[in-house]
């Protein structure tokens, strides 16, 4: 057991799977000699060689497409994009090739690919380096979308993503890459890619979040507990497929739902969760569900970034509004 950052946990998972399975390869810009833009792949090339840790040109479409070719020929590529906002040139390959290969070939050919990238605001970077567009990929049939919120989750979820027979979008919240540490056991045990995790039980309010927002949610839950408001906190972890069973069970217990995410609110994952809860558990609700999201705008430059990010006080205020708001 080691105390490590989320970034170190990602690196550990990559090491583990490359040792376990010789078909696992890593590719991307600067992933080899330099160990990646955030050093997530540091040490891999020295240990596994240039044939399994491949530096690519600055061409995201190429990275996405080469990964498809590798996967269809029996390899298990882990392709890194330096930031989520850089994935867009590779969208055609991801959506039209990787996501549809199993269906197109009636299951004869699959694409066991992990597309990794950091995502989110909070590191004083402009918009291409601060995107939160997980909803775009969650809309695509054939893709899994996974977002860890802690080092332990990052390790276990990445192991399972690499072992999955279909393409997985694995988005890592760069805001907490190095800002937190927790114990991680290199036991090779993956976490399921179809369940959310209950981080805190509660009776009054269900709060669903993922990624870096979990840190603010947990702090807000502690603050609210001092005011005798007990929040049940669910870490979604896997955006697609949604673990609606766990969400619905929690909402039926608490009667209230707050969804918190950094991405803009319109047509987002929060809207999908609220719609599903309203369809399937309307009579259990004591108040209308609420979303607390980013604004419908590009992430601002760093001087105004603090006004864009959701704080624990924002979450606490939203929780109070839910507790005070009742159906007419």
Task: Give the residues covered by each predicted segment.
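Thiamine diphosphate
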Residues: 1-167, 171, 176, 307, ...
């Amino acid at each position: 057991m080691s105390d490590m950052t989320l970034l170190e946990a990602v690196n550990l998972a990559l090491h583990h799977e490359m040792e376990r399975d010789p078909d696992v390869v890593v590719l991307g810009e600067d992933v080899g000699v330099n160990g990646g833009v955030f050093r997530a792949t540091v040490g891999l090339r020295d240990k596994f060689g240039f044939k399994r840790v491949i530096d690519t040109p600055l061409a995201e479409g190429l990275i996405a497409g080469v990964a498809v070719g590798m996967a269809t020929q029996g390899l298990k590529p882990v392709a890194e994009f330096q930031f989520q906002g850089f994935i867009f040139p590779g969208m055609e390959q991801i959506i039209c090739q990787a996501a549809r290969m199993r269906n197109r070939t009636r299951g004869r050919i699959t694409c066991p690919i992990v597309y990794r990238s950091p995502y989110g605001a909070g590191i004083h970077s402009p918009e291409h380096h601060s995107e939160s567009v997980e909803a775009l990929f969650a809309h695509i049939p054939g893709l899994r979308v996974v977002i860890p919120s802690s080092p332990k989750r990052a390790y276990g979820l990445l192991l399972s993503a690499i072992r999955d027979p279909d393409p997985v979008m694995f988005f890592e919240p760069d805001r907490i890459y190095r800002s937190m540490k927790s114990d991680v056991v290199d036991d090779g045990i993956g976490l399921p890619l179809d369940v959310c995790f209950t981080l805190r039980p509660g009776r009054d309010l269900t709060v669903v979040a993922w990624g870096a927002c979990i840190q603010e949610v947990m702090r807000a839950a502690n603050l609210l507990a001092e005011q005798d408001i007990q929040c049940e906190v669910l870490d979604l972890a896997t955006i697609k497929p949604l673990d609606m069973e766990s969400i619905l069970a929690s909402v039926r217990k608490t009667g209230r739902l707050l969804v918190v995410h950094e991405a803009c609110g319109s047509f987002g994952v929060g809207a999908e969760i609220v719609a599903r809860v309203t369809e399937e558990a309307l009579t259990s609700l004591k108040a209308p569900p609420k979303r607390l999201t980013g604004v419908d705008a590009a992430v601002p430059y760093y001087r105004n970034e603090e006004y864009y990010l959701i704080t624990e006080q924002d979450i606490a205020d939203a929780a109070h509004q839910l507790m005070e708001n009742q159906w007419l």
